[in-house]
Regions:
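GST superfamily/GST-like fold recognition
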Residues: 36-40, 78-103, 116-117
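GST-like domain detector, emphasizing the conserved glutathione-binding G-site
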Residues: 1-55, 69
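Domain-level recognition of soluble alpha/beta enzyme cores
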Residues: 21, 108-110
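Alpha-helix C-capping/helix-to-loop hinge sites
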Residues: 4-8, 48, 74-75, 95-100
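Surface-exposed helix-capping loop/turn segments at secondary-structure junctions
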Residues: 7, 70-82, 121-127
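Amphipathic alpha-helical packing segments from all-alpha helical-bundle domains
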Residues: 54-72
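Structural helix-adjacent loops and short alpha-helical linkers that scaffold large soluble proteins
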Residues: 9, 55-56, 101-108
Length: 127
């Protein structure tokens, strides 16, 4: 993803802003994807009943969505005031959170952000 976006406005030119973008990209891989995407995979593709899904995934996903909601409470994007790769990486699984058992209406700032990013990227709405 970084290679494909090199030289575009999706990667901030400013070193500090670029570091913030990387911080969110790393966080997505370690704290977000590992809960929301894994739960979605187990529920949607493996068709596991709730009782067979790793119990730690639900609170971990709720924690990730809560942190995102707090961060987005007073901003429209994760880094700066415009779309970056951080938003693209985070929207990928967040927009499918309902399939993982998370109701995004419980995180209104995240819900509004998903709608905004889907619109900007021309994606079919999932929420």
């Amino acid at each position: 993803m970084l290679h494909l976006a090199e030289g575009s406005s999706l990667i901030p030119a400013d070193a500090y802003e670029r570091a913030l973008m990387h911080q969110w990209l790393f966080w997505e891989q370690y704290s977000h994807e590992t809960a929301i995407a894994v739960r979605r995979f187990q529920k949607t593709y493996l068709k596991k009943p709730e009782s067979e899904i790793d119990l730690s995934l639900k609170p971990k996903g709720e924690g990730a969505l809560t942190l995102m909601n707090r961060h987005l409470a007073d901003r429209n994007y994760f880094v700066m005031d415009r779309l970056t790769l951080a938003d693209i990486a985070l929207v990928a699984y967040t927009r499918w959170a309902d399939e993982a058992g998370f109701d995004l209406n419980d995180w209104p700032s995240v819900c509004q952000w998903v709608v905004r990013i889907e619109s900007e990227l021309g994606l079919e709405p999932q929420t």
